[in-house]
């Protein structure tokens, strides 16, 4: 990736894409070291330094805890880029391009390998970079060095020593040799290789308890283990061992060429062998002590040898001066001083710690480390050196100061401690809350709808132009292989009201640019009320995504003027497959506390072995237990949270809840479901009103009565309402009484008058359902109240011969009457109807034997045709009207309808 592409990527971090971003007051890290915010990803195995000869091919390996979106490697020349003590120079790392014949980069899931051909122009420092969406995690530096062996100066030393038998002799053969890596040594006596009694002596040959058999000429040879190069040292030592008879008593003393003191440097964790040179007659004995190191001799790691002291697993506190006393009873004794320096790789004791920071604020990041030699600190901001950032300044104590935090600083900040033994790094998430950019006022005409962006000349009538404040860019968290969770917020403002939100996303690929996709769901804004001074926060999930793809997201806000405005896009998010992710700690719901009628409090905990550093916050899901719909969601920021209040619930309702933890990369499994309920509504208590005298009236209280208190009304208002109700009751009673008195007279006067409306009410139209839901015959009766209508009916029958369909609008079913007859009239009507029925039957019987002629009075046929299969008459054809002509009925039958019944249609 080119530096320009990297810069554009960093510039895309306009907000913290890792956390919710309300505006917070600046906070400072706690005085005691605490876990720094972690992105959930880290370098598991950093590349290691290699020493190799020219022409060799070496492999650097880098492994991350999660599979990154991509790996890259950077390089800079060495040793020009760093001093001999390992301090960092000013040269910059450059990104490498694979396939130029000198190097090759391969990737296998979360492991990247860099193959380098060792050449003079490839010697230097390498480090790998893992891209996790907006996060850039950089490994420590690995050094590629050339294997070499050289001799300091060409001064030859030929020593001749004469010693009494039983003494120990120390010969330093390799002090003039410099080798990278450390050389292996071979020793020869009279040209024959011998095996040294003590190994790892760094070119020092130590002969113990010499005898005449030890006499001879000694030489040595150095071999480079990496290149195999061998250097034969021209120096030599001739040893002569005296016989025991001719030796005289001598105090302990040094031989020619032996040092009076030594300086030993060793790496922590190695095995240290201290040798005490000196001979005497009789053979002296060595006694060890140290004025600087407590219990240097008497501990489990120390073993006293003949003229030697061995310390295993050397620690930093073993540094100091060691004194060897040689004593054989002849004065004076010999003192030999050895200064031991234990080198310790750098260790970061106080990692950086960053909190959510507003754009433009000043921030100081602290980092402290120990090591021998003292390590040098340097900083990387999303993989870029702080030296190249104009807003960054590194103080003499190693602290980093950002004078004005910018959006480009959002991401992963790493502190590196370095000395010649190696490097160590520690990092923290730096989250930047950007300044809200007020949008320019836009006028929308009457035709402006959703997505309208037409610009018009502003018309100012003395009012402030309305503004559309966009939502913040969404923070993205993985939920599953095919879904993510988005979190955004709207800062507190006095702009246009937002009606709802839409989520848009786009897949990023190397080919053709993909279009933005819009989800179908409308995310409601809710009540136009700010939850806090910080604004309102929202969450939404996006499903049907593809794993191992890179996406960008943005939020579209629709305002009350039917216009819309998009948020800034999120940083690139690489959707990891679940198999490649480190599992997140799963919270355990402990209790659902009934807090109020509309709120509950969730209480949870984490397992004792859970890594809290991986957690950024929690998602709470809840819904009524009687519902099978989607869950409502709430976001809980902070890994240390153990309780959370959920409000705006319904009273006396049982809900089910579940939790999951999340980080910038993934989310945990859901906790077990747990049910809880809100409190029942409190029963209101009513206080009986008390009558107070004028003197007892309280004139100092002006508070409004509470919701559970009864307000007493004034006596005048109470009397007015009571009197009106009583008057209304009297009027209704009088009206009902008058109606009942007039009813008998009216009934007697109107019982002999035509009651066409009442008769019509007794019949229902054909084709409709019978009120009593029973099968009835298809019988319709036409009652003519006018005696002269018989002739008109005959003329009508001639116009409509039998078989011709007639209008069915006037056809009715007869139903049970719903009014009460006068008893006398009921008896009279019943007898008249029976006579009429017998007359009709005789007339029908007389005509049944002959030809029907013009009359279709076949009653049996009509009855059969009128049989219905159900309560509703649904005949496919309209029934014809059957007219039966007969002589005039008796006078009694006239009372049937208070008139003449001239024709009956059946």
Swiss-Prot record:
Keywords: Disulfide bond, Glycoprotein, Heparin-binding, Immunoglobulin domain, Membrane, Proteoglycan, Repeat, Signal, Transmembrane, Transmembrane helix
Keyword Chaperone on entry: no
Residue span, Ig-like C2-type domain: 39-144, 134-236, 252-341, 346-433
First-listed, main subcellular location of the protein, grouped into a coarse class: membrane
Disordered as annotated region, ranges: 427-476, 673-713, 789-906
Biased composition regions of type Low complexity, renumbered to the chain: 854-866, 890-906
Annotated Fibronectin type-III domain residues: 470-578, 586-681
Signal peptide range: 1-20
Quaternary structure annotation from Swiss-Prot or TrEMBL: Homodimer. Heterotetramer; 2 iHog chains bind 2 hh chains when facilitated by heparin, heparin is required to promote high-affinity interactions between hh and iHog.
Name of the protein in question: Interference hedgehog
Organism: Drosophila persimilis (Fruit fly)
Lineage, opening ranks: Eukaryota, Metazoa, Ecdysozoa, Arthropoda, Hexapoda
Gene from which the chain derives: iHog
């Amino acid at each position: 990736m080119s530096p320009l592409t990297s810069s554009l990527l960093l510039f895309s971090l306009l907000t913290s894409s890792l956390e919710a971003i309300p505006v917070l007051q600046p906070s400072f890290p706690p005085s005691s070291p605490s876990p720094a915010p972690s992105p959930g990803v880290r370098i598991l195995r950093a590349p290691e330094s290699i020493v190799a000869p020219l022409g060799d091919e070496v492999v650097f390996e880098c492994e991350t805890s999660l599979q990154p979106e991509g790996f890259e490697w950077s390089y800079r020349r060495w040793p020009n880029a760093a001093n001999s003590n390992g301090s960092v120079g000013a040269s910059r790392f450059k990104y490498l391009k694979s396939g130029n014949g000198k190097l090759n980069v391969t990737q296998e899931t979360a492991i990247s390998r860099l193959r380098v051909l060792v050449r003079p122009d490839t010697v230097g420092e390498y480090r790998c970079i893992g891209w996790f969406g907006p996060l850039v995690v950089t490994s420590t530096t690995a050094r590629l060095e050339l294997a070499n062996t050289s001799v300091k100066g060409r001064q030859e030393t030929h020593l001749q020593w004469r010693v009494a038998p039983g003494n120990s002799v120390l010969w330093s053969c390799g002090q003039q040799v410099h080798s990278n890596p450390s050389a292996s040594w071979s020793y020869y006596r009279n040209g024959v290789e011998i095996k040294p009694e003590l190994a790892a002596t760094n070119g020092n040959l130590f002969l113990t308890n010499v005898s005449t058999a030890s006499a001879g000429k000694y030489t040595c040879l150095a071999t480079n283990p990496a290149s195999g190069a061998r250097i034969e040292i021209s120096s030599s030592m001739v040893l002569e061992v005296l016989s025991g008879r001719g030796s005289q008593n001598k105090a302990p003393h040094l031989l020619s060429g032996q040092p009076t003191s030594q300086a030993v440097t060793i790496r922590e964790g190695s095995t240290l062998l201290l040798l005490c040179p000196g001979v005497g007659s009789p053979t002296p004995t060595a006694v060890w002590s140290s004025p600087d190191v407590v219990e240097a001799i008497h501990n489990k790691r120390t073993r006293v040898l003949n003229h030697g002291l061995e310390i295993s697993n050397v620690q930093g506190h073993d540094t100091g001066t060691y004194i060897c006393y040689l004593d054989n009873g002849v004065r004076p004794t010999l003192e030999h001083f050895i200064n031991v320096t234990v080198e310790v790789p750098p260790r970061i004791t106080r990692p950086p710690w960053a909190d959510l920071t507003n754009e433009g604020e000043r921030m100081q990041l602290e980092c402290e480390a120990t090591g021998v030699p003292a390590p040098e600190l340097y900083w990387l901001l999303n993989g870029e050196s702080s030296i190249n950032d104009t807003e960054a300044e590194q103080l003499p104590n190693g602290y980093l100061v950002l004078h004005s935090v910018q959006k480009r600083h959002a991401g992963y900040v790493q502190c590196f401690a370095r000395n010649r033994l190696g490097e160590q790094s520690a990092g923290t998430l730096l989250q930047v809350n950007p300044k809200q950019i007020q949008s320019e006022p836009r006028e929308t005409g009457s035709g402006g709808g959703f997505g309208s962006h037409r610009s018009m000349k502003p018309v100012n009538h003395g009012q402030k132009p309305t503004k559309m404040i966009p939502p913040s860019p969404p923070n993205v968290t993985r939920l599953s292989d095919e879904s993510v969770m988005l979190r955004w917020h709207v800062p507190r403002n006095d702009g246009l009201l937002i009606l709802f939100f839409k989520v848009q996303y786009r897949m990023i690929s190397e080919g053709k640019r993909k279009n933005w996709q819009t989800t179908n769901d409308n995310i409601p804004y809710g009540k136009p009320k700010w939850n806090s001074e910080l604004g309102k926060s929202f969450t939404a999930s996006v499903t049907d995504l593809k794993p191992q793809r890179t996406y960008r997201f943005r939020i579209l806000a629709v305002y009350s003027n039917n216009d819309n405005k998009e948020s800034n896009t999120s940083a690139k998010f690489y959707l990891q497959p679940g198999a490649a992710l480190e599992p997140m700690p799963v919270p355990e719901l402990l209790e659902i506390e009934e807090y109020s009628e509309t709120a509950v409090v969730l209480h949870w905990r984490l397992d004792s072995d859970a890594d809290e550093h991986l957690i950024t916050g929690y998602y709470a899901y809840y819904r009524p237990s009687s519902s099978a719909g989607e869950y409502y969601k709430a976001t809980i920021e902070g890994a240390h949270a153990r309780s959370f209040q959920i409000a705006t619930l319904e009273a006396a309702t049982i809900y089910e809840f579940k939790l999951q933890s999340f980080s910038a990369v993934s989310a945990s499994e859901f906790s077990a479901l747990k049910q809880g309920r809100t409190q029942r509504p409190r029963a209101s208590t009513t206080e009986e009103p008390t009558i107070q005298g004028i003197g007892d009236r309280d004139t100092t209280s002006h508070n409004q009565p509470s919701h559970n208190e009864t307000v007493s009304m004034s006596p005048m208002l109470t009397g007015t309402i009571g009197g009106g109700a009583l008057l209304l009751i009297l009027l209704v009673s009088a009206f009902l009484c008058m109606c009942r008195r007039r009813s008998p007279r009216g009934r007697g006067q109107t019982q002999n008058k035509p009651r066409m409306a009442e008769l019509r009410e007794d019949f229902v139209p054909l084709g409709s359902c019978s009120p009593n839901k029973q099968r009835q015959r298809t019988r319709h009766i036409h009652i003519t109240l006018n005696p002269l209508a018989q002739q008109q009916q005959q003329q009508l029958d001639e116009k409509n011969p039998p078989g011709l369909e007639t209008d069915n609008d006037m056809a009715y079913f007869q139903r049970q009457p719903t009014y009460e007859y006068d008893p006398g009239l009921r008896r009279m009507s019943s007898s008249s109807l029976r006579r009429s029925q017998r007359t009709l039957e005789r007339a029908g019987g007389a005509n049944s034997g002959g030809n029907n002629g013009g009359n279709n009075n076949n009653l049996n046929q009509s009855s059969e045709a009128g049989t219905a299969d159900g309560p509703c008459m649904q005949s496919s054809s309209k029934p014809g009207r059957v007219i039966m002509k007969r002589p005039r009925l008796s006078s009694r039958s006239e009372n049937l309808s208070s008139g003449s019944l001239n024709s009956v249609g059946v």
